[in-house]
Amino acid sequence: MKRSKSYRAAAEKIDFEELYAPLDAVKLARETSTVKYDATVEVAFRLGVDPRKADQMVRGTVNLPHGTGKTARVLVFAVGDRAAQAEAAGADIVGGDELIDEVAKGRLDFDAAVATPDLMGKVGRLGKVLGPRGLMPNPKTGTVTMDVAKAVSEIKGGKIEFRTDKHANLHFVIGKASFDDTQLVENYSAALDEVLRLKPSSSKGRYLKKATITTTMGPGVPVDPTLTRNLTGEATAV
């Protein structure tokens, strides 16, 4: 793949043989952003798990302390009082049977979906539409619940879902290039802490193999996955 001149110039500033401390990595990622708009900052983790095995699938949610820089559009499958509560909490799309039919026909103008348990029998039929996109409500991630207001508020506040892909990678949006370094490091640390907490007991050998921070269209900066940074800037082993 041929890279642009600006990408190649940015990549020259990175030593790809070095593992950078998180604070240095976010500074370098912001410095080497190659787009003129407010780039998205992401982190990718390569895990030492076999995602083909159910007991090694790493899946969960994390509340980023500074959000992602984007307000998620939230759809809620609910009726009656729960629908009203979802709307009051800021849900963008709320409905029951008619909404389920719309989604079945391809409506996908949302970033997260929540459902009340009583509708999951019908929502479950949307698995082929929502599942591949990571949008299927799931009780393990708090998106199948009667407390729809809380779920909507958390998602709007920066709660994100994650799961390993078929190559054992995890991807997180941790903010925007306009965030300051401390905000990005704190979001990175929150994501890292949750990934470490969810290590499967059946995973053998090295669990966290690789971490990379990158911006939209920018080169990836390798991060030392054994370090995090506290607010004093001290390196702390994890």
From Swiss-Prot:
GO terms for cellular component: large ribosomal subunit. This is Large ribosomal subunit protein uL1. Binds directly to 23S rRNA. The L1 stalk is quite mobile in the ribosome, and is involved in E site tRNA release. Protein L1 is also a translational repressor protein, it controls the translation of the L11 operon by binding to its mRNA. Gene3D superfamilies: 3.30.190.20, 3.40.50.790. HAMAP family: Ribosomal_uL1_B. SUPFAM superfamilies: Ribosomal protein L1. The keyword tRNA-binding applies. Part of the 50S ribosomal subunit. InterPro entries: Ribosom_uL1_bac-type, Ribosomal_uL1, Ribosomal_uL1-like, Ribosomal_uL1/biogenesis, Ribosomal_uL1_3-a/b-sand, Ribosomal_uL1_CS. GO terms for biological process: regulation of translation; translation. Keywords: Repressor, Ribonucleoprotein, Ribosomal protein, RNA-binding, rRNA-binding, Translation regulation, tRNA-binding. The keyword rRNA-binding applies. Belongs to the universal ribosomal protein uL1 family. One of its GO terms (molecular function) is tRNA binding. PROSITE patterns: RIBOSOMAL_L1.
